[in-house]
């Protein structure tokens, strides 16, 4: 199978090489961080003036590298001062006090460092404490719809979109295939690996059954406003007693492993961020569907909202849930410099009541920022309704806004 290059990420990485900046590739396991690093390695290795030091902590041959002393020794043995050194370390969080090595080699001339990791808290805390702002974090997401088409050799049509909605964008599915049993088995395996290595072991969690029940609850309630208290009450009704503090901690651990994303509420009129009642979305809608038992009746709205959220992040927006006095906006999206848009996500707008709900809340916002409704309404490509742009999901995923 030919290697498919995710060029936008490669371009981001290349922009920061040679600038004395540590490049940190972050994201959930199995979304393609290792492949990005290998692509950079393969590009640089062909130049004889370069020296590549490559460490993959998921390979047994690198098991002896457990501490920063081990890392220093390995790099020192392979470092060539007469060449441009590229130090590439995959899943670096598995090396104790790795940041001490990174700090020492960052100041070496003609040296670039690229590392990957699957734990947000550990990477940001250690790197920011030790080396300050001299690093660039690049977030790697699961496949976009356009990438999904490329990886699976599909033509853009309704059938391909249905497959993307159902199975999501884990790159490894290109080898596994999109037969339901095989795809779901692979997704559950990845989910269990993330849960074990990046949540349970990393945070020494003992109440594993509750953690699994919590993830299922969040999968069933994707895109709904949720508080720790509401989860605690639900769990109590199911015969399981747990504190709100423990729930907050567990959710934080899931977000740090990038399997889950928390979206805060934003008061559109008061222009402030609320501290309670957030929404949660999954990194990959295929994993979300596997956890929830597939896309059941009534789930399609949740999955579409999850896909739209992820693509808005991919387009570079900071995303919030919009709160009105008498309603809600699915997404308030901002960029540095003052850019803002409002987005409502819907499945199919099939009657007047649905139309009034989706468009009415946007009409209630009395400013001039762009407003969008994204849906799968048949025969729709893109149209304008009194200043609100209605766009089909496929067009949004292939062309943006």
Description of each model-found segment:
Residues 2-17:
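Pre-Walker A adenine-sensing motif
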Residues 25:
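Hydrophobic anchor at the beta1->P-loop junction of P-loop NTPases
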Residues 36, 40:
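Hydrophobic positions on the alpha1 helix immediately C-terminal to the Walker A/P-loop
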């Amino acid at each position: 199978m030919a290697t498919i290059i995710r060029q936008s990420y490669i371009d981001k990485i290349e922009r920061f090489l040679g600038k004395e900046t540590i490049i940190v590739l972050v994201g959930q396991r199995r979304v393609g961080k290792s492949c990005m690093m290998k692509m950079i390695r393969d590009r640089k290795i062909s130049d004889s003036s370069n020296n590549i030091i490559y460490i993959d902590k998921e390979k047994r041959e690198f098991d002896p590298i457990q501490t920063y002393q081990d890392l220093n020794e390995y790099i020192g043995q392979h470092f060539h001062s007469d060449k441009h050194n590229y130090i590439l370390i995959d899943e670096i969080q598995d090396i104790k006090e790795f940041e001490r090595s990174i700090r020492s080699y960052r100041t070496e001339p003609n040296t670039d460092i690229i590392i990957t990791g699957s734990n947000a808290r550990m990477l940001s805390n250690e790197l920011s404490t030790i080396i300050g702002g001299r690093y660039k974090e690049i977030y790697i997401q699961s496949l976009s719809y356009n990438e999904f088409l490329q990886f699976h050799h599909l033509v853009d049509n309704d059938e391909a979109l249905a497959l993307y909605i159902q199975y999501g964008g884990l790159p490894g599915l290109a080898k596994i295939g999109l037969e339901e049993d095989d795809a779901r088995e692979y997704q559950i395996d990845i989910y269990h690996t993330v849960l074990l290595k990046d949540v349970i072991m990393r945070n020494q969690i003992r109440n594993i059954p509750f953690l699994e029940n919590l993830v299922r609850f969040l999968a069933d309630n994707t895109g709904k406003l949720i508080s720790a208290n509401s989860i605690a009450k639900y769990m109590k009704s199911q015969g399981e007693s747990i504190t709100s503090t423990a729930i907050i901690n567990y959710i934080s651990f899931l977000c740090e492993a990038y399997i889950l994303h928390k979206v805060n509420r934003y008061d559109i009129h008061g222009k402030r961020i609320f501290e309670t009642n957030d929404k949660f979305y999954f990194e990959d809608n295929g994993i979300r569907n596997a956890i929830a038992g597939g896309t059941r009746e009534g789930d399609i709205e949740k999955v579409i909202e999850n896909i739209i959220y992820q693509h808005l992040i991919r387009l570079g927006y900071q995303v919030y849930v919009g709160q009105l006095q008498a309603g809600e906006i699915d997404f308030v999206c901002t960029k540095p410099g003052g850019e803002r848009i409002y987005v409502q996500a819907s499945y199919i707008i099939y009657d007047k009541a649905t139309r009034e709900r989706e468009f009415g809340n946007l009409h209630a916002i009395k400013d001039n920022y762009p407003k969008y409704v994204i849906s799968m309404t048949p025969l729709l490509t893109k149209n304008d309704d009194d200043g609100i742009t209605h766009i089909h999901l496929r067009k949004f995923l292939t062309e943006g806004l």
